[in-house]
Amino acid sequence: VFTTMMVLLLGEIDISIASIMCLSGCCTGVAFEAGLPIVPAMMVGLLVGAACGFFNGILLVAFPDLNSTIVTLGNQILFRGIAYMILEDKPITSISSKMSFLAWSKVAGIPLILIVFFVETLIFAFVIHRTKFGRSLYAIGSNAKASRFSGIKTNQIKVLVFTLSGLCAGFAGLFLISKLGSARASIAKGYEMEVIAMAILGGVSTAGGKGKVLGAVLGVFSIGFLRYGLGIVNVSSQ
């Protein structure tokens, strides 16, 4: 959700993150089945995610008149299509025993995924609120043209943010296939709207230049509690 927040701060949007999660997970599974140890296979998934995000960013910089909604929507279909071409919706289950530690491990009784989320929160809070790079995000989102004239490298920052978005989506994809116990081309459908909703619910403006990490965290927990509550009363959250 934090890289989605960064994209929104720029006044852009990334609808392809769920498909990147899926493609990264599928590539991790394929790499593992091809004989790579689990850690290098996971690195393949992360690299695929970063490459997808980089592709989004490069397209938006190369064709500035294109809307990020249209670009990432098109790439959402493209990335999902590549995943189907690779797996044909045949699940890879051989990774379940090797990757289960991501979703189910605990450190001192605390789930690993919660620890990772806490560490990510601290890192992104520092980067967004305490660094020159973070201040540049707010400036670009508020007025991209003025930011460019003031010396901010808007194009480079845009490509970097979308690359980070893809990388983190790939990272989330690893946790997802770890939880599911398999990689398949149909996973993570609809997740992009949920993640964007978390950020917006936390007060991040879709117009750019406004939002806090704390708000995004509250958005995550709000959606999480909503899903949990629906589960208790046996109502699908999909």
Predicted segments with their positions:
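Transmembrane helix-bundle core of multi-pass membrane transporters
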Residues: 66-133, 157-160, 179-188, 235-237
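Transmembrane alpha-helical segments in multi-pass inner-membrane proteins
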Residues: 169, 183-238
